[in-house]
Swiss-Prot record:
InterPro entries: CarD-like/TRCF_RID, CarD-like/TRCF_RID_sf, DEAD/DEAH_box_helicase_dom, Helicase_ATP-bd, Helicase_C-like, Mfd, MFD_D3, P-loop_NTPase. ATP binds at G646, D647, V648, G649, Y650, G651, K652, T653. This is Transcription-repair-coupling factor. Its EC number is 3.6.4.-. It comes from Staphylococcus aureus (strain COL). One of its GO terms (molecular function) is DNA helicase activity. The gene is mfd. Residues 633-794 form the Helicase ATP-binding domain. Residues 808-969 form the Helicase C-terminal domain.
């Protein structure tokens, strides 16, 4: 974008602005938003000061940020994102916005140069005093000394929470001399101490817990945007006591007990960890002299104000709404007089003393004495929307008037295509600027602004894809590392105390933890399991592969089995019979598919390439891979049967559209089958829009079509006139005949009834089939389905998708009003989820009173199908602002303009349901908001509380996401295998079911389990060999290490585990060293045919297999073991070699030496 800024800065009009920009009370009028951004960016580039840009709300700040990213390096652009909803302090929220706020405050506190965008709400927000913030920024360097206790206290003050293992943002842990920290900004870091000196600093991966790169120094930012120290708490307690005493006599007697409870709950501050999420609502009482963000700026900072009059309008509501919210919570006994989140000074007072430049599109009166007024003439650009003739004449006008024409397109490919198009129009154009740009020609560059603009006095016009082709600007993602790092998923198999488990031989029990037991004077670790009644089972950790976590549907609580009973055997037998039946069906399907002959498509045509280049967005890697897999299938003679699995809005439709186009280009017809009329309409419109420039006849068959139109479509399918038909189950009517059906696309097949599914089966015969689903299919299950259906998965979201900002808070009408107003003010729409049909119309009336100007509709499952569809269609077409609805919106509704979701009584929903509902919003380039409300003062059940806790972690990839994914995987398994199997999965748990199915399928196909080259080795030595709690306190980490040791088969793996232990837990004690020695002995034994190593008190007994006995080179062995002398004796038992080793000092070393010699004798024998 340097071309554009070069043209701007050389112009006299900009130079006039530049001279007075940054002087007190300057007004600049006439500039459109994108033109204004260009000027501000250039001013920033030419100055050495901090520049503060103030907007009226966060939505406007986001829009300006997107354009500014085209001119300013992301490292120098900062935003202070505060919701326009004052009550956000009362909610649990996603960490993304907080990490941006912390990044901004930290840069300001360090005096960094930058352009800072702050909405009015952020300008007024009470903050930690500047000096306190500066004192809590830490830079650690290798070789420095630290006071560990002081350092850990500081982390707590900064909002970090102490855990045994760090797995989430904002956590830290101490294990021996190792401190792990996961800051909100940057990589997780591991600090290793030598006494009090920092010996090393390393990045580490939270998923593997392994160190990555060494660094010399690291900045540790706070994990909260408030610093809370012991002194702050002490001051807070005094202020809170006064506020409580002032409030109590002034409220109704009936709520005084509630107020007392609120006061008492706030008094229970733990000194080890201050809950910043709760304390933030008491910010007005926390600091003697709180700051606002303006005090964080340098004294010579420049201020630019975007649309002063809009800011003053917003300021009015910012004063009224918090007042009414605070009044509400005080009246209900949930708040105190004096509680506030913002400074109530007016806007002008807040920015007093700084040079301010005001930007306004129109010249309006302002209550400010202005020193300079700069007027620009700026026009919007003609909207061409792909109309070639209009585009040519307008470009010709610019050339004739000697304009500098800047054309912005979003990819390199489009730069080339645009140049070719202008060349056809005989418009001179270039794509690179060598020295200076001549007027009367176009320069085409890669870039993007929210809109184009024309500055006639400068002779400059900027044209974007929005004007050229009606494309929306792609949201630029300014990423700090915090987001990319957010919550890596660990397996849902993590075992926690109290979890249900399945033991292969004993059935369903409950995991009670790892216990160290002394058996025969030897300490070992055992997994403790609880069964029915008082039955308990201790499983040695080396047999832990027999224990799996019980995974089933979210709402399924299993029944504990009785130890030693026949109940579990009967259950397994019943499931076994069922999986064998399914295996039989799968084998038949597999054979049928292998035999079938279908149409074999050729390579992509030139039209296909042109069509694909017309897609206005970059494909994600997963989309590209899925398209390649589908085309490969189509180019084979065997009919395709592929399942395309991807979250809602991840671009499955575009993949399907390309497959459809390929089929049509070879003269084949395509049927696109969808479960609802609304979806049919949406897919139909997408296809029409994507294929408008190509000779493809597309028709729709649904209730939105007249009988006459349906009849014509049927005729067109029969004669071959119609290429693509989109429709609901009407497509499955027996009276529909295709001339040459080549591809059937089925969206969400599981939503069709049994009769329709049978009809789909008959249609599938010898035709390529692509099935789309948003319900994830477990890979393990797919593997056991042996390719009856191929699977493609889209797991990465499109580039311009942002994590939905998620809030969990108590129900409150003034908050709901704010949330609704904020979404409607950005011309968006709202889903309001209320799951009680009997009172849903009363809820609508209640919301209508709150929002008298809003158009509110109702949708629920008891409406007639036609009424429901008409309502939904009206909502999609933007005829309603708010849709009060039940969970019927959970699947299959695409409303990109609806970006706020409010759910009442969220504690009553399952996590997977909440996950899918949340997927309704945030599906355009705007940030989506989801508000999960639960009733105030309601005593929640333990399950609901756990669920809300999980939802609180329900950010980009939190543990709530894992649980939702688990439940959805099981739902996906049920969809694939049928309802009855869903029940069997719940009986024995998902993992054991998958294992049994895979075994049954392999048996039917005659595939035997590959027999191990060597038998299982039993090593039984009377040694204390385990992981002591003093060394690894976290049980999950302990189990994880035991699992790795159990699977170890090579010496490289042993070295890797040793490195990991030292990396994560520091030097290991003697018990761990012995455990590693035993694993090393076992690896030697595995490679040399040893079947048993048993400690018999004074001797060690070693048994070899018959095969190993035949292969060993005895001469080599005896030579190698001479140092052992008479302590070693060799014998033969049942044609197999036995060796006894007499125990002496250092006998463990002797044993290691002996098994190594046996292995080498075996190797030499093999080589000979």
């Amino acid at each position: 974008m340097t071309i554009l800024t070069t043209l701007i800065k050389e112009d006299n009009h900009f130079q006039d602005l530049n001279q007075v920009f940054g002087q007190a009370n300057t007004l600049v009028t006439g500039l459109s938003p994108s033109a204004k951004v260009t000027m501000i960016a250039e001013k920033y580039a030419q100055s050495n000061q901090q520049l503060l840009l103030i907007t009226n709300n966060l939505y406007q700040a986001d829009k300006l940020e997107t354009d500014l990213l085209q001119f300013i390096d992301a490292e120098e652009l900062y935003k202070y994102p505060v919701q326009d909803i004052m009550t956000e302090e009362f909610s649990t929220q996603s960490p993304q916005l907080m990490s941006e706020r912390i990044r901004t405050l930290t840069a300001l506190a360090q005096g960094k140069k930058g352009l800072f965008i702050v909405p009015l709400n952020g300008l007024k927000k009470w903050l930690t005093p500047v000096e306190m913030w500066q004192n809590h920024q830490m830079t650690l360097r290798v070789g420095e000394d630290i006071d560990v206790d002081q350092f850990l206290n500081k982390l707590v003050n900064m909002g970090y929470k102490r855990e045994s293992v760090v797995s989430h943002i904002g956590e830290f842990s101490l294990r021996g001399g190792i401190i792990d920290i996961f800051p909100l900004i940057g990589e997780p870091i591991r600090i290793e101490l030598f006494d009090t000196e920092i010996d090393s600093i390393r990045d580490f991966d939270v998923e593997t817990q392994r160190s990555k790169d060494n660094v010399e120094e690291v900045d540790i930012t706070t994990a909260s945007d408030y610093i809370i120290t012991e002194e702050v708490i002490s001051h807070l307690k005094e202020e809170l006591k006064t506020a409580y005493e002032n409030t109590r006599p002034k409220i109704d007697k009936s709520v005084r007990n509630d107020l007392k409870e609120t006061y008492e709950s706030f008094k229970l501050f733990e000194s080890t960890y201050f809950d910043h999420q709760i304390l933030r609502r008491l910010v007005a009482f926390m600091y003697e002299t709180p700051s606002t963000i303006i005090e964080y700026f340098q004294k010579d900072a420049i201020i630019a104000v975007d649309e002063f009059n809009r800011i003053k309008e917003t300021e009015e509501s910012l004063t009224v709404e918090p007042d009414s919210f605070i009044s509400n919570i005080i009246e209900s006994g949930n708040g105190f007089i004096g509680q506030s989140f913002i400074k109530y000074d007016d806007f002008e007072t807040l920015i007093e003393g700084y040079p301010v430049t005001y930007f306004s599109l129109f010249a309006t009166t302002m209550p400010i004495k202005l020193n300079h007024i700069i007027k620009f003439s700026c026009k919007p650009v003609q909207q061409f929307y792909g109309q070639y003739d209009i585009m040519r004449s307008e470009f010709q006008r610019y050339v004739n008037q000697n304009y500098h024409i800047v054309v912005l397109v979003e990819t390199e490919t489009k730069v080339e295509r645009m140049q070719a198009m202008l060349s056809e129009m005989h418009i001179p154009s270039i794509t690179k600027l060598h020295r200076s740009m001549s007027s009367g020609q176009a320069v085409i560059i890669e870039g993007s602004l929210s809109e184009g603009f024309e500055l006639p006095d400068m002779g400059l016009v900027v044209i974007t894809e929005r004007e050229l082709f009606k494309s929306k600007q792609k949201k630029q993602r300014k990423r700090t590392k915090a987001i990319s790092n957010a919550e890596k998923i660990k397996s849902y198999q993590d075992l926690n105390v109290g979890d249900y488990i399945v033991h292969v031989h004993h059935g369903v029990g409950r995991y009670l933890g790892v216990e160290t037991l002394e058996v025969g004077q030897t300490h070992r670790d055992y997994i403790k399991l609880q069964y029915k009644g008082t039955d308990q089972l201790f499983v040695p950790v080396d047999q832990m592969d027999q224990v799996q976590k019980y995974v089933a549907s979210e709402d399924k609580t299993p029944k504990l089995n009785k130890l030693g009973g026949s109940e579990w055997k009967k259950t397994k037998a019943k499931v076994q019979q069922s999986v064998e039946d399914i295996a039989e069906e799968l084998i038949d399907l597999y054979k049928e598919r292998e035999m079938a002959e279908g149409y074999q498509y050729g390579e992509d045509t030139a039209e296909q390439t042109t069509f694909e280049l017309d897609f206005p967005y970059e494909l994600t890697p997963d989309q590209a891979k899925s398209i390649d897999e589908i085309k490969d299938d189509m180019q084979k003679s065997r009919p395709m049967d592929r399942l395309l699995c991807g979250d809602v809005g991840y671009g499955k439709t575009e993949v399907a559209v390309r497959a459809a186009f390929k089929a049509v280009m070879e003269g084949k017809q395509v049927a696109f089958l969808v479960p609802t009329t609304i979806l049919a309409q949406q897919h139909y419109e997408t296809l029409i829009e994507r294929m408008q420039d190509f000779p493809v006849e597309i028709q729709l068959m649904s209730r939105f079509r007249t009988p006459k139109e349906i009849k014509q479509t049927k005729e067109g399918l029969k004669t071959g006139f119609v290429d693509i038909v989109v429709g609901t189950h009407k497509l499955l009517s027996k009276d529909i005949q295709y001339k040459d059906l080549g591809l059937l696309i089925v969206d969400e097949e599981q939503r069709f009834g049994v009769r329709h599914k049978e009809r789909i089966k008959t249609l599938k015969h010898n035709v390529d089939v692509l099935t789309l689903t948003a319900t994830p299919i477990p890979r393990t299950l797919h593997m056991s389905m042996l390719g009856v259906r191929d699977l493609s998965v889209i797991e990465t979201p499109p580039e311009n998708r942002f994590p939905v900002q998620t809030y969990v808070l108590e129900q409150n009408m003034s908050f709901i009003k704010e949330a609704l107003e904020r979404e409607l003010s950005r011309d968006g729409q709202v889903f309001y989820l209320y799951n009680k049909v009997q009172s849903i119309y009363e809820k609508r009336e209640q919301l209508q009173m709150l929002m008298p100007d809003a158009n509110i509709a109702v949708a629920h499952g008891q409406m007639t199908e036609r009424d429901l569809e008409e309502t939904m269609l009206s909502f999609i077409n933007n005829e309603y602002d708010i849709l009060v609805t039940t969970t019927i919106i959970e699947t299959g509704v695409d409303v990109p303009n609806a970006n706020t979701l409010i759910i009442e009584d969220a504690d009553r929903f399952g996590l997977s349901q909440l996950y899918q509902l949340r997927g309704r919003v945030g599906r355009s380039s705007r940030i989506g908001y989801a508000y999960f409300l639960h009733p105030a003062n309601k005593v929640l059940t333990e399950t609901a509380e756990d669920r809300l806790q999980a939802i609180k972690e329900f950010t980009e990839l939190g543990s709530g996401f894992k649980i939702a994914m688990r439940d959805l995987n099981i739902r996906g398994a049920g969809n694939l295998l049928g309802k009855q199997q869903h029940g069997f999965i719940d009986t024995v748990g998902f993992d054991l079911y998958s294992q049994m199915l895979e075994e049954a399928v392999n048996e039917k196909r005659g595939i035997k389990e590959p027999e191990s080259e060597v038998p299982e080795v039993e090593v039984d030595l009377n040694l204390d060999a385990y992981l002591p709690t003093e060394y690894i306190a976290n049980e999950q980490a302990k189990i994880e290490i035991y699992k790795k040791l159990r699977k170890t088969e090579t010496f490289d793996q042993i070295i890797d585990i040793k490195d990991e232990l030292i990396d994560r837990f520091n030097d290991y004690p003697v018990e761990v060293a012995r455990l590693l020695d035993i694993v090393e002995i076992k690896v030697h034994a595995l490679h040399s045919g040893i079947t048993l190593i048993k400690d018999k008190g004074k001797i060690i007994d070693i048994h070899l297999s018959v095969k190993a006995t035949e292969n060993i080179d005895g001469e080599v062995l005896f030579k190698a073991t001479q140092p052992l002398g008479r302590t070693m004796k060799v014998g033969v038992q049942n044609n197999a070699m036995t060796i006894t080793l007499t125990k002496q000092n250092q006998w463990l070393d002797s044993l290691k030496f002996l098994v190594k010699c046996i292995e080498e004798s075996m190797r030499i024998s093999d080589e000979a």
